[in-house]
Amino acid sequence: MAAIIADKIFTHVQIRVAVWKDPFSMIEGRGLQVCQSLFAIGTGSLVWKWGLGNGRPFDIPVRESDFVFSVICEEFGVIFGICLIFVLMSSFILFMDISTRSRKLFNKLLCLGFGVCFLFQVFLSIGGVTKFIPSTGVTIPLVSYGGTSVISTLIIFNIIQGLHMLADSEEEEYEHIKAQESE
């Protein structure tokens, strides 16, 4: 509902949706980023085709931040890009594991919220690069260039690491209390 309202009110949203629907009709203008991204992913082969530095990643606008996934797929191959997605998904799964192991509701919800934010950021970035959704300009956590993005992601990882240590100490304390009660 909000997306429909935003599409009607904001012109930049209308432009992004139009580029998402048919980027090749605007290849000389606003569709250049998405078209070059799709060309890079398509020419990257399944595995390392030309070698590092022998592709043409400089043709992709904003290649260091928003469209780094297409550069990775072109330089290292689509299989490497899929492996990167699996690494990011495994981070999310670990966040959910820490969330389920926490005993306190606040810790569970905090870890769950950070994990969903992390996954949503990955989805927005890779989805925009592959034309699955309109491009949003969101970076891939810890992969794309962007100082604020890297710092905030590292803070999130540190908080989740702290929650993991708390979950371990809570588990040890719970087992200790349970052992004392059984004696």
Where are these regions (language model features)?
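Membrane-proximal intracellular helices of multi-pass ion channels
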Residues: V78, L94-N107, E173-E183
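Hydrophobic, glycine- and aromatic-enriched re-entrant/interface helices and adjoining loop segments
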Residues: M1-C83, R103-L110
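Loop-to-helix entry and N-terminal half of a specific, functionally important transmembrane alpha helix
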Residues: I98-G137, V143
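Alpha-helical transmembrane segments of multi-pass membrane proteins
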Residues: A3-D7, V87, V116-L124
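Membrane-interfacial segments
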Residues: F10-Q14, M96-R103, T136, L163, ...
